[in-house]
Every structure is written in structure tokens, then in C-alpha cells.
A protein has these predicted regions:
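N-terminal secretory signal peptides
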Residues: 1-16, 39
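N-terminal export leaders
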Residues: 13-31
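N-terminal small/glycine-rich loop or linker at the start of catalytic domains
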Residues: 57-75, 128-139
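Structural preference for beta-strand elements that scaffold enzyme active sites
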Residues: 61-65, 98, 124-128, 163-166, ...
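Glycine-rich, proline-tolerant flexible connector loops at the mouths of alpha/beta enzymes
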Residues: 100-117, 171
Length: 377
């Protein structure tokens, strides 16, 4: 995720849900997926992976990326280092070329792990990281040009690289004009330390302001079957207009769309931020079950899983969308990538949207403090 993402506890296993819905055996091996905007397949040293590519602006990446926050922070205790490295390298072996991290994840531990894991294959992958918080101070947004350049130098060292492929502003800093932010990143691009510029949870006005100074390659914001803000606030539209890619975080609704949550699910207040997020209260989980049911029914119909339907739905929305599901589990990694083989037809999408349209999403996905950092209006 971005900033203070919720931390999934390791209580219910999402595969228990698949068993109860008679879908446990139907994970991979489904009919080929054809999605507008996907290009040629990726190859690795292990051979053909069938992973297609998409364009974020002018940057070509695998159609599914890998969110690396949950491996080392925010989703319960950090994974064992060897496990984390193995998961990242397994993603690459399956064709993933786009890895997402941030200074604030840990802080620092995610970048360190990503840097070590990808160092032997650095020339085969694209790494995205983020600046924008006063990590050493009060944690508030901080995007002064001096801070941006300081973070860039530190991130380069942690990532064991001489360039950052995509450098996002993690959250808009209301105290620093967007033109100054874009100008600082432009200077880093001119120096060769950064290749592409991105924004996270920025609104249309700031996207345009940034793009007028330095081409914006990608916007990263929360987007999933249950979280539709980018469809309504103009962000997807401005991305299409300006040739900017879109990277959804929380592509399975912070775990809600996996299907394992119930109104009885409780989140550990010490390790899982969702305990304070309104959407994950018992009453709102119960109220939102009709939304989950749409995904569950389509998964049963297609002989696949709710996770794969959720990711396939995102891939079908726009040709410039590249979801970044995160996991520390090799089994879940393979399940995520199985979404590429799920064939959602136009009729499937219409059916899902018609079922969703009359429903109300209950509860914000984050608490008020986190929502205040996002330009979603």
C-alpha cells in the first residue's frame, strides 16, 4: 500500500474460504486472457512466463507488479529475510518486472530487502519507490526540494542501485507548491538518478500542475472493485488524457475481496491498522458482504478465486492499469498471477457493474487522519 496501510493478520487463511465455496481446486490453468493494452510476453532465465506487458506512460512493465510493503512491514511481524527475498525473486521468475516499495515502509526495511533481492537481476526489473514523509521527525508530509534529494540519495543506497526507475511523491504536501516538487524530481531526472516521476493519491489539479513541469509517468491510488474513487474524481480520466499510467494499491480491498473476512473477524490493534479503519468494523464488513458476493459468484461461475476475479476486473478497466498486489506467500503469489488467465468478457463486466451499481459501500477504507492525506474528492 501507501503510507499507513493496514496490516493483514495471519488468522483466517483465505483458502479456507475457497474450500467452503467449492473452489479450492480451481486456481490456475484457465483459458487464456486477452486484455487490451497488454503487449508481448515477458521472459526470464527460466524461460517463457506468459506475463504480458503494459505501458505506464513511456515505461514498459509487467501487467501485474509486486507490492513489497507487506513483506517487511505493516502486515504483522516482518517476514523472515530469506522468505522475503525468495518471494521477490519468485515473482521475477514468474515474469514480474515491476516492484513497488517506499522509504516509509518499515521505515527503510522494505527498500533494503528489495535492494538485496533484486541486485543480481537489477537490469531486468523496474523499481518504484516513494518520498514525501518526514520519516525522521513527526511523520507528516514533507516534500521540500532538499528533502526530496536527500531521500533520493538514501533510497539509492538502500536499493543498491544507481537509478530509481519511478520516484513517487507518496502524498501531496500542502505546504510545498507542486511545481517545486516536480522541479526537484526533474533535476534528479536530468542527473540520471531518477528515470520517471509519479504521484500517489493526488487529485486532478495537482496532477496537471506536476505534469506541466515534469511529465508524470504514473499515479498510484487505492482502486478496487469495492473502492471506486478514481472512477468518480476524474483521476482515471486525466490519466487517459495525458498518457499517464495508473497503479492501483489495495487491489483486493485490503483483503476484503479475498473472501476470508466475516463480521466476526477481529484485527490485532498492535499489528493491524484495520482495527481502526471504518470499513473493517464488524457492522461494515457485514453491510459490505453483498459487494463481496458479486465477486464470489463470478469466481464460482468462472471456476477461479475471488482474488483472481478482483485482479482480472482491474486489468479489464483500462489498458494503462497495472495492479501491484502484495504478498509474503509463494502460494498467494501464484494465485495472484493466475488472474492473468481469467477471461472476463464484456458481458461479465456488465453483469458485475449492474450488480454493484445499486449497492452502497459502507465505511471509509482508512481512518480520518489517513483519508485527510488523500486527494479523493
Amino acid at each position: 500500500m501507501n503510507h499507513s496501510h493496514a496490516a493483514i493478520n495471519h488468522g483466517p487463511n483465505r483458502r479456507k474460504f475457497l474450500v467452503t465455496t467449492a473452489m479450492a481446486g480451481a486456481v490456475l490453468g484457465i483459458a487464456p486472457l486477452t486484455l487490451m493494452g497488454s503487449s508481448h510476453s515477458q521472459q526470464t532465465q527460466k524461460g517463457e512466463t506468459n506475463m504480458k506487458t503494459r505501458k505506464l506512460g513511456t515505461m514498459e512493465v509487467s501487467e501485474l507488479g509486486a507490492g513489497c510493503m507487506s513483506i517487511s512491514s505493516n502486515y504483522g511481524p516482518p517476514a523472515d529475510k530469506a522468505q522475503g527475498i525468495a518471494t521477490i525473486r519468485a515473482a521475477h521468475a514468474e515474469g514480474v518486472t515491476f516492484f513497488d516499495t517506499a522509504e516509509v515502509y518499515g521505515p527503510y526495511t522494505s527498500e533494503l530487502l528489495v535492494g538485496e533481492a533484486l541486485e543480481p537481476i537489477r537490469n531486468e526489473v523496474k523499481i518504484a519507490t516513494k518520498f514525501g514523509f518526514n520519516v525522521e521527525g513527526d511523520g507528516a508530509p514533507l516534500s521540500t526540494p532538499a528533502q526530496i534529494k536527500k531521500v533520493a540519495e538514501a533510497s539509492l543506497k538502500r536499493l543498491r542501485t544507481d537509478h530509481i526507475d519511478l520516484f513517487y511523491q507518496h502524498r501531496v504536501d500542502p505546504k510545498v507548491p507542486m511545481e517545486d516538487v516536480a522541479g526537484a524530481v526533474k533535476e534528479l531526472i536530468q542527473e540520471g538518478k531518477v528515470l520517471h516521476f509519479g504521484l500517489s493519491e493526488a487529485g486532478v489539479a495537482n496532477i496537471r500542475r506536476a505534469h506541466s513541469v515534469q511529465r508524470v509517468t504514473a499515479i498510484q491510488s487505492e482502486y478496487s472493485f469495492i473502492e471506486r474513487a478514481p472512477e468518480h474524481n476524474g483521476v482515471l480520466g486525466v490519466c487517459a488524457e495525458l498518457g499517464i499510467g495508473f497503479v492501483p494499491w489495495g487491489p483486493v480491498g485490503m483483503g476484503f475481496l479475498t473472501g476470508w473476512m466475516t463480521p466476526e473477524t477481529r484485527f490485532d490493534p498492535k499489528t493491524d491498522y484495520r482495527h481502526k479503519f471504518p470499513r473493517f468494523s464488524p457492522e461494515n464488513i457485514r453491510a459490505n458482504l453483498p459487494i463481496l458476493d458479486i465477486v464470489v459468484k463470478k469466481a464460482a461461475e468462472k471456476g477461479t478465486t475471488p482474488v483472481q476475479i478482483s485482479l482480472a476486473w482491474l486489468l479489464s478497466r483500462r489498458p494503462f492499469i497495472v495492479p501491484i498486489p502484495g504478498t509474503r506467500s509463494l502460494a498467494h503469489l501464484s494465485e495472484n498471477h493466475g488472474a492473468r488467465a481469467v477471461a472476463l468478457t464484456e458481458a461479465d463486466i456488465r453483469q458485475m457493474e449492474a450488480a454493484f451499481a445499486p449497492l452502497t459501500v459502507h465505511g471509509e477504507s482508512m481512518d480520518a487522519a489517513n483519508m485527510a492525506l488523500c486527494e479523493r474528492a
